[in-house]
């Protein structure tokens, strides 16, 4: 076998090994600034440490998807796991509940993490 063919086979084997790795996402929900009722803020959902890259993330207000949600570009860490930041402007108050819902192949179903205004 020529050296270039051997190198190509080795590269394909190493890439296929990367696809076999699955890592469950870590989900963190927090506000950009300390929350004050009636004062505009940003709700953030930072999802990290997951593999493969295909993932669904929704920000929720009282269980319903929020509009005008933006997100960072998909990025990866040194260990080849991925991370993303989803965020939207919101105005906290005492009655509304906010959360982040994530669905990934490593989860048995969507996982919802509530925003804790005291964190």
UniProtKB/Swiss-Prot annotation:
Subcellular location per the Swiss-Prot or TrEMBL entry: Secreted
Coiled coil: none
A cellular-component GO term for this protein: MHC class I protein complex
Keywords: Disulfide bond, Immunity, Immunoglobulin domain, MHC I, Secreted, Signal
Ranges where the Ig-like C1-type domain occurs: 25-114
GO BP of this protein: antigen processing and presentation of peptide antigen via MHC class I; immune response
SS bond list: 45-100
Gene3D superfamilies reported for this sequence: Immunoglobulins
Pfam families assigned: C1-set (PF07654)
Primary location class: secreted
First and last residue of the signal peptide: 1-20
Matching InterPro entries: B2Microglobulin, Ig-like_dom, Ig-like_dom_sf, Ig-like_fold, Ig/MHC_CS, Ig_C1-set, MHC/Immunoglobulin
The protein's assembly and partners: Heterodimer of an alpha chain and a beta chain. Beta-2-microglobulin is the beta-chain of major histocompatibility complex class I molecules.
Protein function: Component of the class I major histocompatibility complex (MHC). Involved in the presentation of peptide antigens to the immune system.
Family: Belongs to the beta-2-microglobulin family.
Protein name as catalogued: Beta-2-microglobulin
Source organism: Macaca fascicularis
Taxonomic lineage: Eukaryota, Metazoa, Chordata, Craniata, Vertebrata
